């Protein structure tokens, strides 16, 4: 069916003698797609898009379905694989799956200004046809053993679960493939928002007069047998800095290749800001770095590897950030990779200071800048940690700092060179670094008296699971489960807890909100004979916040677990993992990894600002999907998590007054988590607690006028309470979009003017 497009924002209808076309006047133009009969049934469809670009570029088109049940928490975006389309006709096809009946459809044609015509159509497919389409696309993207594994797994899914299971599983992989191939192209993004041309740099330099203080940066660079080509490129990137109060401190680690020292000396003769020392014997990177630090006279020390490069504005942005944030004693920036041809790729847009993520991966790394006095306080680099010497340094530095003394500049200011032997090219290149990092983290736990151990993650070099010990005896956990009938779901939930939970001390408290079915009431009678289960009646209109607050008041467990009745436990260690974090005094609310029954992600943490208030990360991606820089597989601090499965110490719950009973259904968990965060605790999400979430199956969907009106009131309430804070999630980089899928590039970035 061909679809009619009606402009809603940032679009002008234009015409000339030959045709009628559209002009996108901003970076967020959108159409309302007019659906036959006002809605479209859920299911599988092939989408065809034909655009004729007349002027400018079409980049990153996206389709946004709105569902009849108010799928609010997971506002879905379906990227269309069209990147940097310039003058001429462009056609593209992708498969889409509407998870329920679609009541409205929004089409955003481009994130860039342009003039164009567009035709959009949908054709419905059956499950088998959809599976065939996805399998064909996925096989074309694989080769060899990868194709064999995909075919075998698909055949197994078909045999064990029929066409539906096969299509569901394929869709998870297809969604991940679509994201990998359709994400906004970094080249286009840097063209618009990171102009390193002479003209672009000249414009950026206009901010230099803002600087009142001009601290000196001592750039510490150890060298050893560096290919001269990359050594020159590295030093040139320092010499080209727009900010001029720097010194480059080079320590050559007794390179056998004489041209390395000759090259360094040629730069020393040319620029008095370059200082160098040649070590008599090779001592490896930590010792060489310390030799370079001995040359430093600046207030701040920045770390630079001998074959990498600084962005021309790196020191300028660091100086501006330090002036605006005088408490900072340490800062880190975003980074990307650069190949031998100078092409940039794979940006790492980082979270602000994220202590738990930092223990799972070195999310500080490049560019790291430290107050020189701090480096001297901790004794510089420690030998014996080569390959992870910068991680060990950062661990020891942060032990002496308050969180507000650790800053993040959300700009790509460091380019990590991808050459043979570099971990930028392949993280497994230096396996010794993997084990050095483990030792560094273990040493950190010894120094801080933290009862935790570092566990490797099989198949992932440089990423770790931190397992915290729980006290003996284990504190009592009260699991609160609100329910109304749907005994099938409740039985599945409780059975899975009893059969698959290794944590030794918990009680299950069912909060009955007016169940009437005889099967449910009979089940209640049977389960109350279990010593760890009781049923509390709650005879009032449904209010998720009020029900759980009531349950908390009527129980005494040191730890409170909030669980929906449609949750099903997967891994036996789920509660031990969550409680081990919740018992840490600095931690507030702890969330889990939740999957839909088809093994796609339903919840991998909540990002503030997505869709206006908040949204889930990585919705619809297959189980095992790594996410941006493996963040979907690592424990980390986040601003919020879903209360469908959350754990929190009773003292924290009570300190903030529990859930806000003015929020009956929507966003009560987001509001609760923000209040906990504002009270000084860090919320945390762990992928090592895995459960299924058969979402909203008991309460029903937000599909009536009254429910929709209530949802809008609650949305407005949260927006009014938290305001601009919702668009400034410290754990979500401002270079990522709030309007498209989480962790895709923002057009423009929200920090463009800073």
Residue ranges of model-derived segments:
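N-proximal low-complexity "stem/linker" segments adjacent to membrane-targeting elements
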Residues: 164, 168-239, 442-446, 450-499
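Cell-envelope/extracellular polymer assembly enzymes that use nucleotide-activated donors
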Residues: 215-220, 247, 392, 476-480, ...
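Acidic donor-binding segment of Leloir-type glycosyltransferases
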Residues: 239-278, 498-537
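Glycine-rich, basic loop-to-helix element that forms the pyrophosphate-binding segment
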Residues: 279-296, 317, 538-555
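Short aromatic/hydrophobic "clamp" motif used to bind/position activated sugar donors
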Residues: 301, 560
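Conserved donor NDP-sugar-binding/catalytic core segment of glycosyltransferases
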Residues: 313-345, 419, 567-613
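Short, flexible, basic/aromatic active-site loop/helix in glycosyltransferases
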Residues: 343-363, 592, 609-639
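A short, conserved alpha-helix in the catalytic core of glycosyltransferases
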Residues: 374, 384-412, 441, 574-578, ...
């Amino acid at each position: 069916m061909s679809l009619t497009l009606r402009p809603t924002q940032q679009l002008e209808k234009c015409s000339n003698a030959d045709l009628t076309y559209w002009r996108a006047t901003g970076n967020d133009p959108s159409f309302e797609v007019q659906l036959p009969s006002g809605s479209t049934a859920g299911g599988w469809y092939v989408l065809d898009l034909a655009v004729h670009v007349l002027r400018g570029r079409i980049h990153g088109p996206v389709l946004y379905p709105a569902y009849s049940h108010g799928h609010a928490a997971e506002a879905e975006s379906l990227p269309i694989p069209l990147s940097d389309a310039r003058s001429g006709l462009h056609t593209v096809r992708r498969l889409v799956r509407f998870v329920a009946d679609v009541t409205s459809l929004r089409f955003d044609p481009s994130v860039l200004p342009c003039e164009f015509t567009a035709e959009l159509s949908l054709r419905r497919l059956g499950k088998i046809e959809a599976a065939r389409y996805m399998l064909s696309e996925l096989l074309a993207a694989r080769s060899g053993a990868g194709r064999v594994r995909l075919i075998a797994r698909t055949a197994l899914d078909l045999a064990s679960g029929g066409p539906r299971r096969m299509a569901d599983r394929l869709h998870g992989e297809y969604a991940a493939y679509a994201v990998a191939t359709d994400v906004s192209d970094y080249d286009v993004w840097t063209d618009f928002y990171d102009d390193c041309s002479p003209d672009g740099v000249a414009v950026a330099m206009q901010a230099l007069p803002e600087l009142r203080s001009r601290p000196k940066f001592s750039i510490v660079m150890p060298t050893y047998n560096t290919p001269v080509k990359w050594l020159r490129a590295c030093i040139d990137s320092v010499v080209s800095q727009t900010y001029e109060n720097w010194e480059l401190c080079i320590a050559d680690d007794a390179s056998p290749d004489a041209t390395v020292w000759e090259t360094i000396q040629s730069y020393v003769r040319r620029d008095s800001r370059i200082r160098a020392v040649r070590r008599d014997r090779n001592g490896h990177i930590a010792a060489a770095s310390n030799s370079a630090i001995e040359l430093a006279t600046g207030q701040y020390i920045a770390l630079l590897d001998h074959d990498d490069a600084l962005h021309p504005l790196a020191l300028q942005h660091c100086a501006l950030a330090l002036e605006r944030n005088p408490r900072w004693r340490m800062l880190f920036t975003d980074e990307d990779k650069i190949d031998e041809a100078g092409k940039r790729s794979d940006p790492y847009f980082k979270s602000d200071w994220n202590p738990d993520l930092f223990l799972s991966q070195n999310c500080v790394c490049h560019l790291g800048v430290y107050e020189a006095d701090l480096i001297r306080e901790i004794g510089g680099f420690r030998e014996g940690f080569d390959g992870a010497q910068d991680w060990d340094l950062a661990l020891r530095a942060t032990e002496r700092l308050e969180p507000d003394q650790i800053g993040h500049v959300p700009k790509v200011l460091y380019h990590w060179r991808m050459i043979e032997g570099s971990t930028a090219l392949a993280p497994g290149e230096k396996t010794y670094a993997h084990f050095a990092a483990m030792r560094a983290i273990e040493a950190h736990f010894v120094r801080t008296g933290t009862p935790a151990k570092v566990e490797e993650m099989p198949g992932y070099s440089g990423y770790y699971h931190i397992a915290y010990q729980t006290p003996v005896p284990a504190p009592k956990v009260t699991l609160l489960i609100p329910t109304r009938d749907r005994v099938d779901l409740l039985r599945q939930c409780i059975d899975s807890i009893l059969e698959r939970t290794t944590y030794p001390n918990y009680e299950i408290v069912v909060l009955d909100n007016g169940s009437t079915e005889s099967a449910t009431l009979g089940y209640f009678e049977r389960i109350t004979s279990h010593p760890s289960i009781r049923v509390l009646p709650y005879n009032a209109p449904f209010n998720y916040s009020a029900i759980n607050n009531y349950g908390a008041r009527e129980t005494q467990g040191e730890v409170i677990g909030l669980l929906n009745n449609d949750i099903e436990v997967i891994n036996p260690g789920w509660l031990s993992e969550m409680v081990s974090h919740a018992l840490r005094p600095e931690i507030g609310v702890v969330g889990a990894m939740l999957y839909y029954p088809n093994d796609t992600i339903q919840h991998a943490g909540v990002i503030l600002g997505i869709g206006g208030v908040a949204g889930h990360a990585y919705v619809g991606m297959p189980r095992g999907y790594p996410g941006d820089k493996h963040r979907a597989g690592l424990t980390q601090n986040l601003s919020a998590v879903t209360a469908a499965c959350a754990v929190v110490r009773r003292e924290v719950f009570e300190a903030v007054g529990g859930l806000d009973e003015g929020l009956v259904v929507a966003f009560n968990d987001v509001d609760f988590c923000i209040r906990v965060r504002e009270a000084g605790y860090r919320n945390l999400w762990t992928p090592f607690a895995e459960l299924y979430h058969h979402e909203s199956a008991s309460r029903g969907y937000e599909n009536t006028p009254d429910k929709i009106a209530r949802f809008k009131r609650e949305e407005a309430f949260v927006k009014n309470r938290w305001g601009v804070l919702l668009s400034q999630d410290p754990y979500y980089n401002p270079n990522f979009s709030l309007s498209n899928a989480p962790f895709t590039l923002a057009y423009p970035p929200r920090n463009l003017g800073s």
